[in-house]
């Protein structure tokens, strides 16, 4: 069954002001699907995700849910329903787990009931975070910080999650657990996923395309 395209890029070029890092990239992410981008360090995988979000210089055509987003600011892309979970986890280390999660819902700060519901939903996926909700994020293990980064992205109620190397630096059992939960998020919450990954075996097992 072919899926309708949620995200579509055509002839995408990206740079940080110097030579182009991405040249003429075209791809689609199906609505409700999981698409994987594989490649070694330095291949431009992280730049691809940043280009979608407007975090670097770009040209080409990028459409999300039928809207052109190649000229939109990062915050406007986020408001459309794109959650970017960067490599290095990107958590605010001095804040508690729960404060980090609430920051993830900053675009919906008036929706107190919905935010409370979504907190319980992510704690259902990641029970360890519930145990550590009052703990400073900087004292969490690497695996817990990755769970927190994914959960913070979920607090946006995204249509699409961009995941940058979620397995990096983590023990294999923790990685398997995180990938299992990502599949559940995809299937139960109907969140599409664009996954950048070096671990080809795990990534291809998770992906539709």
Task: Label each residue range with its predicted role.
Residues 4-209:
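Glycine-rich phosphate-binding loops of nucleotide-dependent enzymes
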């Amino acid at each position: 069954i072919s899926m309708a395209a949620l995200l579509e890029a055509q002839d995408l070029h990206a740079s940080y002001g110097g030579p182009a890092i991405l040249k003429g990239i075209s791809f689609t992410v199906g609505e409700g699907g999981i698409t994987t981008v594989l490649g070694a360090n330095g291949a431009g995988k992280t730049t691809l995700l940043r280009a979608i979000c407007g975090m670097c210089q770009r040209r080409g055509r990028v459409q999300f849910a039928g809207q052109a987003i190649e000229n939109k600011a990062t915050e406007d892309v986020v408001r459309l329903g794109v959650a970017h979970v960067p490599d290095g986890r990107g958590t605010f280390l001095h804040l508690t787990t729960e404060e980090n999660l609430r920051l993830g819902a900053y675009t919906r700060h008036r929706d107190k009931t919905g935010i409370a519901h979504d907190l319980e939903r992510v704690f259902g996926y990641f029970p360890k975070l519930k145990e550590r909700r009052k703990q400073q994020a900087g004292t969490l293990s690497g695996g817990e910080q990755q769970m927190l980064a994914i959960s913070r992205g979920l607090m946006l109620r995204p249509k699409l999650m961009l995941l940058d190397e979620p397995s990096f630096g983590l023990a294999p059992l923790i990685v398997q657990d995180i990938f299992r939960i990502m599949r559940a998020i995809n299937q139960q919450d109907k969140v599409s996923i664009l996954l950048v990954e070096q671990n080809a075996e795990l990534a291809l097992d998770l992906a539709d395309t």
